């Protein structure tokens, strides 16, 4: 795992077409902005896990 330190307004680039920018830091929460091509799905981990579980449930029917 790559661990980076960023300040508000600073950006991390992934490949040529994905950028993650730190927008705000308040207490223990960090607000980030993600720019990615429309064909790249972006989900919070807990939402992605729900999507995976729903897909597995549909495949077992």
Swiss-Prot record:
Protein name in the entry: Translational regulator CsrA
Disulfide bridges in this chain: none
Superkingdom in the source lineage: Bacteria
Pfam families documented for this protein: CsrA
GO molecular function annotations of the record: mRNA 5'-UTR binding
UniProt-listed SUPFAM superfamilies: CsrA-like
Keyword Membrane assigned: no
One BP annotation, GO: regulation of carbohydrate metabolic process
Lineage, uppermost ranks: Bacteria, Pseudomonadati, Pseudomonadota, Gammaproteobacteria, Pasteurellales
Subunit relationships: Homodimer; the beta-strands of each monomer intercalate to form a hydrophobic core, while the alpha-helices form wings that extend away from the core.
GO terms under cellular component: cytosol
Cell location: Cytoplasm
Keyword terms: Activator, Cytoplasm, Repressor, RNA-binding, Translation regulation
Keyword Cytoplasm: yes
Described purpose of this protein according to its UniProt entry: A key translational regulator that binds mRNA to regulate translation initiation and/or mRNA stability. Mediates global changes in gene expression, shifting from rapid growth to stress survival by linking envelope stress, the stringent response and the catabolite repression systems. Usually binds in the 5'-UTR; binding at or near the Shine-Dalgarno sequence prevents ribosome-binding, repressing translation, binding elsewhere in the 5'-UTR can activate translation and/or stabilize the mRNA. Its function is antagonized by small RNA(s).
Family under the similarity heading: Belongs to the CsrA/RsmA family.
Gene designation per UniProt: csrA
HAMAP family named in the record: CsrA
Originating species: Actinobacillus succinogenes (strain ATCC 55618 / DSM 22257 / CCUG 43843 / 130Z)
């Amino acid at each position: 795992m790559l661990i980076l330190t960023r300040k508000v307004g600073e950006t991390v680039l992934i490949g040529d077409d994905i950028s993650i920018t730190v927008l705000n830091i308040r207490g223990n929460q960090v607000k980030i902005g993600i720019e990615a091509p429309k064909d790249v799905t972006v989900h919070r981990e807990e939402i992605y896990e729900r999507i995976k579980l729903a897909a597995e449930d549909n495949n077992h029917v």
